[in-house]
């Protein structure tokens, strides 16, 4: 029987409830720090407060405090928001911190125990530039062995074996680095053997998701067990997105809550708004793709947590879904995107 492998053990898919499929509760994002504009250097070097928050929202990756999403303050704020997520109807969170992002399995387990939210942890590799010496030269075979052990055997955390429940996020730049190609191929190989879900992080160019899927499918991975993340900042043209959808993977809009006039990680594009995300999802629903759509926030900086003036993990449930209902999306369609699709993606027979 297919089950979902959480950090506290396996559960039946129907117990997941509403699920956020791409989040982080602790990670190190300092690699993406950008020097602040000279005019705002003092504000962005200062501690985040009401008097500096406006600058942090404009230049989130220019505040070192903001990208340190792993210190005690961040963990306390994340726990508070997971509890709010639970209060507002949240059931499960898929934690996408992989090798290179300094995943904190101990904290994820503690959150699962203390909040009652189901957590599914990922294995896999982030971009090559963020790997330490022990991982930077791994072969496909070594990666495959590592991923399978993380899923089948698990890692010891405070005396208990904690197993990962999917492979992800598997991240790449563009052109895709050879190390990242190995990670994508290893994900495809292990997916074929184990049947688990996989989540991909493409670079911020339209060609990237297509190339990732080619490598993954050639390695043996199933399209219907693969999520392509961050498509709301990668493929902006709906016709092109529909063309990509023909490959059969899940289409994930996972930057809900990110609304900015200046996108620091790709200054050549304008980040779409939540309203535009809703409109695009409605267009995809009308094209018959409701069974391939997923939604999340990809929270990875402090300023998106409520303790720092952000929206928290409950934003989709409390602010986005009501707007979708107002625009004619049905409860059945919302349940498909937030409950059924995540369960179908995550369920496998380990």
Curated annotation (Swiss-Prot):
Q: Which GO terms describe its biological process?
A: catabolic process
Pfam families linked: PTE (PF02126)
Describe how the cofactor binds.
Binds 2 divalent metal cations per subunit.
InterPro entries registered for this protein in UniProt: AryldialkylPase_Zn-BS, Metal_Hydrolase, Phosphotriesterase
Its needed co-factors are: a divalent metal cation
Locate the residues binding a divalent metal cation 2.
169, 201, 230
Q: What is this protein called?
A: Phosphotriesterase-related protein
Q: Which organism is it from?
A: Drosophila yakuba
Tell me the lineage of the source organism. Eukaryota, Metazoa, Ecdysozoa, Arthropoda, Hexapoda
